[in-house]
Amino acid sequence: MAEQILVTTTENIPGRKYEIIGEVFGVTTQSKNAIRDFGAGLKSIVGGEIKAYTSMLTESRDQSIARLRQNASEMGANAVVMMRFDSGSIAGDMQSVVAYGTAVKFID
Protein backbone atom coordinates (compact mmCIF):
# COMPACT_ATOMS: atom_id res chain seq x y z
CA MET A 1 0.00 0.00 0.00
CA ALA A 2 2.83 2.41 0.82
CA GLU A 3 4.23 2.15 -2.72
CA GLN A 4 0.95 3.70 -3.96
CA ILE A 5 1.57 6.94 -2.05
CA LEU A 6 2.12 9.78 -4.53
CA VAL A 7 5.26 11.78 -3.72
CA THR A 8 5.81 15.16 -5.35
CA THR A 9 8.17 18.08 -4.87
CA THR A 10 5.43 20.56 -5.77
CA GLU A 11 3.09 22.31 -3.35
CA ASN A 12 -0.06 21.46 -5.30
CA ILE A 13 -1.32 18.39 -7.13
CA PRO A 14 -3.18 19.59 -10.24
CA GLY A 15 -6.87 18.70 -10.16
CA ARG A 16 -6.80 17.40 -6.56
CA LYS A 17 -8.03 18.93 -3.33
CA TYR A 18 -6.61 17.68 -0.08
CA GLU A 19 -6.35 18.27 3.63
CA ILE A 20 -3.02 18.39 5.42
CA ILE A 21 -2.32 15.55 7.83
CA GLY A 22 1.14 16.62 8.98
CA GLU A 23 4.88 16.35 8.64
CA VAL A 24 6.25 13.06 7.37
CA PHE A 25 9.79 11.79 6.91
CA GLY A 26 11.93 8.79 6.09
CA VAL A 27 15.56 8.46 7.14
CA THR A 28 18.42 6.05 6.58
CA THR A 29 22.04 6.04 7.65
CA GLN A 30 24.70 3.96 5.95
CA SER A 31 28.34 3.46 6.77
CA LYS A 32 31.22 3.42 4.37
CA ASN A 33 33.33 0.29 4.20
CA ALA A 34 37.02 -0.44 3.69
CA ILE A 35 36.63 -1.37 0.01
CA ARG A 36 34.73 1.85 -0.74
CA ASP A 37 37.29 3.87 1.22
CA PHE A 38 40.20 2.26 -0.64
CA GLY A 39 38.56 2.93 -4.02
CA ALA A 40 37.74 6.49 -2.99
CA GLY A 41 41.35 7.05 -1.96
CA LEU A 42 42.57 5.93 -5.38
CA LYS A 43 39.98 8.08 -7.18
CA SER A 44 40.98 11.13 -5.15
CA ILE A 45 44.48 10.77 -6.59
CA VAL A 46 43.47 10.34 -10.24
CA GLY A 47 40.12 12.16 -10.16
CA GLY A 48 36.71 11.10 -11.41
CA GLU A 49 33.45 9.81 -10.05
CA ILE A 50 33.55 7.53 -7.02
CA LYS A 51 30.89 5.10 -8.20
CA ALA A 52 30.73 3.15 -4.93
CA TYR A 53 29.74 6.33 -3.05
CA THR A 54 27.32 7.37 -5.79
CA SER A 55 25.68 3.96 -5.52
CA MET A 56 25.52 4.23 -1.72
CA LEU A 57 23.83 7.64 -1.91
CA THR A 58 21.37 6.48 -4.58
CA GLU A 59 20.44 3.50 -2.41
CA SER A 60 20.08 5.80 0.61
CA ARG A 61 17.73 8.13 -1.30
CA ASP A 62 15.61 5.17 -2.45
CA GLN A 63 15.40 3.81 1.11
CA SER A 64 14.49 7.19 2.57
CA ILE A 65 11.66 7.65 0.02
CA ALA A 66 10.35 4.14 0.75
CA ARG A 67 10.33 4.93 4.47
CA LEU A 68 8.65 8.30 3.80
CA ARG A 69 5.90 6.48 1.88
CA GLN A 70 5.50 3.92 4.68
CA ASN A 71 5.25 6.67 7.31
CA ALA A 72 2.66 8.54 5.20
CA SER A 73 0.64 5.36 4.67
CA GLU A 74 0.56 4.69 8.42
CA MET A 75 -0.79 8.23 8.91
CA GLY A 76 -3.63 7.55 6.44
CA ALA A 77 -2.24 9.81 3.70
CA ASN A 78 -2.78 9.49 -0.04
CA ALA A 79 0.19 11.64 -1.01
CA VAL A 80 3.19 13.65 0.15
CA VAL A 81 3.68 17.18 -1.17
CA MET A 82 6.73 19.45 -0.96
CA MET A 83 9.11 16.48 -0.61
CA ARG A 84 12.75 17.42 -0.08
CA PHE A 85 16.01 15.65 0.70
CA ASP A 86 18.64 16.51 3.25
CA SER A 87 21.87 14.65 3.90
CA GLY A 88 24.94 14.82 6.04
CA SER A 89 27.92 12.95 7.39
CA ILE A 90 28.05 11.46 10.86
CA ALA A 91 31.41 10.84 12.53
CA GLY A 92 33.17 11.03 9.17
CA ASP A 93 32.33 7.49 8.05
CA MET A 94 28.53 7.42 7.93
CA GLN A 95 26.09 9.15 5.59
CA SER A 96 22.54 10.02 6.60
CA VAL A 97 19.79 10.86 4.08
CA VAL A 98 16.33 12.08 5.04
CA ALA A 99 13.34 12.59 2.76
CA TYR A 100 10.69 14.86 4.27
CA GLY A 101 7.48 16.56 3.25
CA THR A 102 3.82 17.12 4.11
CA ALA A 103 1.42 14.16 4.24
CA VAL A 104 -2.00 14.91 2.73
CA LYS A 105 -5.34 13.13 2.32
CA PHE A 106 -7.44 13.65 -0.80
CA ILE A 107 -10.89 15.20 -0.43
CA ASP A 108 -13.48 13.80 -2.85
From Swiss-Prot:
Per the UniProt record, one Pfam family is YbjQ_1
Upper lineage = Bacteria, Bacillati, Bacillota, Bacilli, Lactobacillales
Judging by the UniProt lineage, the source's domain of life is: Bacteria
Entry similarity comment: Belongs to the UPF0145 family.
Show the InterPro entries listed in the entry.
UPF0145_dom_sf, UPF0145_YbjQ-like
Gene3D superfamilies linked to this entry = Hypothetical protein apc22750. Chain B (3.30.110.70)
**Name recorded for this polypeptide:** UPF0145 protein LJ_1287
